[in-house]
Amino acid sequence: MNKNITIDELRSKYIDFFKSKGHVEISGRSLIPENDPTVLFTTAGMHPLVPYLMGEPHPAGTRLTDVQKCVRTGDIDDVGDASHLTFFEMLGNWSLGDYFKKESIAYSFEFLTDEKYLGIPIDKLSFTVFEGNEDAPRDEESASIWESLGVSKDRIFFLPKEDNWWGPAGETGPCGPDTEIFIDTGKPACGSNCRPGCNCGKYVEIWNNVFMQYHKNMDGSYSPLKRKCVDTGMGVERTVAMLQGKPSVYNTEAFTSIIKSIEDISGVKYGDNEKTDTSIRIIADHVRTACFILGDPKTTLPSNIGAGYVLRRLIRRAVRHGKKLGIDGNFLSVPASAVIAQNAGFYTELKENETLILTELKAEEDKFLETLKKGEAEFEKMLPNLLKNPKKIIPGRMAFKLYDTYGFPIELTEELASESGLTVNREEFDEAFKKHQELSRAGSEQVFKGGLADHSEQTTAYHTATHLLHKALRMVLGDHVQQKGSNITAERLRFDFSHPEPMTEAEKKEVERLVNEAIKADLPVTMEVMPLEEAKKIGAMALFGEKYEDVVKVYKIGDFSTEVCGGPHVERTGSLGRFCIKKEQSSSSGVRRIRAVLEH
């Protein structure tokens, strides 16, 4: 087994292996998903590829591989133990209607067991497959393929749908069984029924192969797909930890320099005490994640909504655990600098955005230290009376007062409560918070409803309208306008763009006029696949800071707009309806935001 493998070596071995199998390496995408309001961050390697898994042709072909940055916000409260991370890297390979189970499983087996690659002994690996249910049959095919490669039957486990099935991403769409690969850590079994997936820590999942062979229909039934796809994912940090024989991802080079920097400023040694170890791990993980979010080409800044709120929560939780370690004042720049130094070789955007990362961390840290001081003092005043309550429950209205008056996050109130043996009436808090939101919205702008990021006619129409808006803004405001991000639902579009000042009413009217003229002209929308360099030569607009493949799709809207884009789009602009700007406002420093609708 390759016990000395580094993270850099694992990345390069994986990519080189799949390139040798006819795959094309594509660039990892932004942590901030484009045109998908259903998630705040890119959560898996497959996320940016959903349109292609749904049937869109990919410019790079049918066999792809990449390294993708991912953030999973559902794990925030679990971070602090030895295994959970909010930011991680995912290695992936895909077949878009090309090979299927036989080749996919064979590739995984070869990469894992061949001495040229990872060299893991077969007797250290276990495999799970779908046991079948009323919707789809038992996946005997995958089990048979594993057996044909030399895996004994006692290492293959049939598990239910909740363990070995992926998708669909929405209510309907592509989905299918998966087969997961686990490595035995050598820990003792938790009992006679100990098996992969039992979460006792003996078996750790390192790779997952998803076989999209069904389509879930609106009535809940499943139909076989004509175009079958494969989507696989391997977690970098977890795999390296297992290969190196480390007890935790926090003992690998992904974290050693970050943890060392926290030890230096706190005077607390990692590994001496589980309570302080938990705080050190939280700081290391959260600062690492914050650096990658702030350093992303589509920079997200701390705020009270969406991805910005998650970022704010990560930073503030790290600050609080710094105080628990006895660190006074600002300190996040120290572990942040370690994160940048550790990762800037592969993720060059971290070094390029180092000043912004450190500046924003300090600004948020300053704000929160003041908030923390006031909020904790108020909580301490409340505590004696709260402890007298036999139910040990903090009323939701009191928790909301901390939030409303002091800006104290509910998550921190819950943490403080837990440390004192108390719980928060979250239902009551949520009710108070909802009333607060309703009052805040009264008399303000139209509330835009959310929606699934699908390829419905209306979502597709808004996507095309976004291209028209982008071009019109450049015509009215100047060529300095660059797209900084967008969010599209079936009800509206939101478009962020670089511009130093608010638009005048005249400018907004002119943008609307240009877009509506293009719509009225019923321009044809055409797509052409071409080399990226050729796209640049013909003046195709592209997303600022985005990484593109060598071959890209270019969508042309008559002679009005030419833009690099994955699609989909309408066939002609005449079907869009009347374009109307509803609001123009600041998104962040130097970035403006437009919300617009199509009216029929």
UniProtKB/Swiss-Prot annotation:
Protein role: Catalyzes the attachment of alanine to tRNA(Ala) in a two-step reaction: alanine is first activated by ATP to form Ala-AMP and then transferred to the acceptor end of tRNA(Ala). Also edits incorrectly charged Ser-tRNA(Ala) and Gly-tRNA(Ala) via its editing domain.
Query: Which organism is the protein's source?
Result: Treponema denticola (strain ATCC 35405 / DSM 14222 / CIP 103919 / JCM 8153 / KCTC 15104)
> Which cofactors, if any, are listed as required?
Zn(2+)
Q: What is this protein called?
A: Alanine--tRNA ligase
The subcellular localization recorded is:
Cytoplasm
A matching Pfam family: tRNA_SAD
Pull one GO CC term from this UniProt entry: cytosol
The protein's Enzyme Commission number: 6.1.1.7
**Which residues does Zn(2+) bind?**
463, 467, 565, 569
Q: How is the cofactor bound?
A: Binds 1 zinc ion per subunit.
Q: What is known of its domains?
A: Consists of two domains; the N-terminal catalytic domain (in this organism this is shorter than usual) and the editing domain; the C-terminal C-Ala domain found in most orthologs is missing. The editing domain removes incorrectly charged amino acids.
Classify the main location: cytoplasm
Q: Name one GO biological process term.
A: alanyl-tRNA aminoacylation
Q: Which PANTHER family match?
A: ALANINE--TRNA LIGASE, CYTOPLASMIC (PTHR11777:SF9), ALANYL-TRNA SYNTHETASE (PTHR11777)
Family, per the entry?
A: Belongs to the class-II aminoacyl-tRNA synthetase family.
Q: Which UniProt keywords apply?
A: Aminoacyl-tRNA synthetase, ATP-binding, Cytoplasm, Ligase, Metal-binding, Nucleotide-binding, Protein biosynthesis, RNA-binding, tRNA-binding, Zinc
Its organism's taxonomic lineage begins at:
Bacteria, Pseudomonadati, Spirochaetota, Spirochaetia, Spirochaetales
The molecular function GO annotations come to: alanine-tRNA ligase activity; aminoacyl-tRNA deacylase activity; ATP binding; tRNA binding; zinc ion binding
Q: Which InterPro entries match?
A: aa-tRNA-synth_II/BPL/LPL, Ala-tRNA-lgiase_IIc, Ala-tRNA-ligase_IIc_anticod-bd, Ala-tRNA-synth_IIc_core, Ala-tRNA-synth_IIc_N, Ala-tRNA_ligase, Ala_tRNA_ligase_euk/bac, Thr/Ala-tRNA-synth_IIc_edit
Q: Which reaction does it catalyse?
A: tRNA(Ala) + L-alanine + ATP = L-alanyl-tRNA(Ala) + AMP + diphosphate
